[in-house]
Each structure stands twice: as C-alpha cells, then as structure tokens.
Amino acid sequence: MKAKRKYILVPFDYSDYSIKASLLAFDLANKFNIEIIFLHAYQDEESNVSEAANNAKDFYDKEIKAGRLPDAAYSFILRKGVPEDEIKRFIRRDEPLVIIMGTRGKDRKINDLIGSVTAEVMDISEAPVFAVPESVELKSFNEIKNIGYATSLSDPDLKAFESMMEFMKPYNFTIMFVHILESGEVASLYKGKIDYLQNYISDKYPNINTAFKLIPAEKSLAVELNDYYVANQIDVLAVKSNHRNIFSRIFVASLAKKLVFQAKTPLIVLH
C-alpha cells in the first residue's frame, strides 16, 4: 500500500510561474507544519542545475528571514529524466498531501496552457493537484473565499471531496457545487443527494458554507461553468477525474484546460 506522509510536492523548473505557485506551498506548509519538497527533473546535462537550486534556496531563505514568506521546512531534489516520469516515480513511492504546480499564461497556445507535464501529473496522481495560472495573484489559502466544485451528482463523491478537505479544512470558505443539467434532466431528481451532501458537510465541517446550483445546458459545458464562475466570483475550481474511466480522464483534461484558459482560475483536480 502506498505511503502517504505529510508533505507538499512542488514540481519546479525555476520559472516565474513555478515560483509564484511555490508561495502557496509555503503558506500551506506553515499552517500544517510539514515539509515542502521541490522536485526538479532535467533531461539534458545541465551544468548549472545545482547552482540554480542554490540560488532558489537563497531567495526563499531571504524571503523567510524578511518576513515576506511563512517559515517552513523545504528541500530540493534533483533528478535527471523526463519530468512527468520522475514525478510519477516519486509520488508512487511516497504520496503527498497535495501537489502544487504553476501553469503558463493565456498568451500560450491552449494545448500548452496547462502544460504537458501538469496535464500528465493530473492524470497519474492519486493526490490532489492544485494548478495555479501565472496570471493569478494568490499568495495565501486564506484568500480563497469561494470554491466552485463541478459535479455530476451521480454519486456523493465524498472520497474526492475529503481529499480536498485534508488540506482545506483549516480555512473558511464557501463551496459551490455546480451541476449542468443535461437534456431531459430536472432539478428535483437531485434533491435527495443535495440534502445528503449539505447535511454531511454541515455536520463535519461547520465552518464551511455550501451552495448548490443546477444549470440547464444551453452552451458547451466549459462555457456554462465559466460563465457561472465569473458571475459568482469563484476563486478556485475543483473537478474530479476518474482514473478508471477513460472518458472521464479525457473530459477532465480538456475541461481543465478550457476553464483555466477562459477564466484564469486556479484548479484542483481530485481523484
């Protein structure tokens, strides 16, 4: 059985968007008193790979000392190999609490937006993956007030929800469950499941507010969700992927890219 110790994994390539995402990792690590592991994988012979890691360490140490960054233990691991392969090997041996990754901005091609590495990690990881677009100014989890949770409501899906709450439990926020009604579906069909989820969450997480929205499908799913999230000031989007369902895997990867591109919203992929 795969181990799951308390640490945060940050796949790292020294880019501006990697550094921006890492600020959230320090915030979370300080809250839970756990370690951050920066994993840098390189394919070519990089003569300056150790120097780059040392420069990054100097930067973080100075930020912590100046009080601009929460104090947290961290370490760098350097691996030669294909990034997604090295990440896969690492998390298979020792599963993290959450993986936090930066993503490129909207000036990139849409297929490159999440990036092949991030998309691959979203697909293979059992741990939640938190993807932060470089255009998003988010330095603390305390800034997250509204989470949009895209759900099929075909199942209470509590396992995926609980994996998110493992690292979001200390914070106060509203989670908005959003379901797009397909042709012929009526909202009343889901009343029992909605009542169950509301009662479960209010009993176990009294500091969390819930809201439910069932939207008739008139546009594409990505556009419907994006319109709702923009109108309701959603800070983070959460979606569930099913490793065993190839349609789900393809759908979530495609939806994730479109939503982050259109709404420039941080994304949590759950399993």
Spans of model-derived segments:
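Small/aliphatic-rich secondary-structure junction motif
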Residues: M1-E51, K145-K193, Q198-A211, I234, ...
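Gly/Ser-rich helix-loop-strand patches that form or flank binding pockets
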Residues: K4, R89-E137, V230-H271
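CheY-like receiver
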Residues: L28, E86-F90, D94, E224, ...
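Short, well-ordered secondary-structure micro-motifs
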Residues: V49, D112, N142, A160, ...
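Short helix-capping segments at alpha-helix termini
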Residues: K65-D71, D203-N207
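Rossmann-fold cofactor-recognition segment
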Residues: A73-F76, F212
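Charged docking surfaces used in two-component/phosphorelay signaling
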Residues: L78-E86, A217-A222
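A short, acidic, amphipathic alpha-helical segment used as a generic capping/interface helix at domain edges
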Residues: Q198, K219-V230
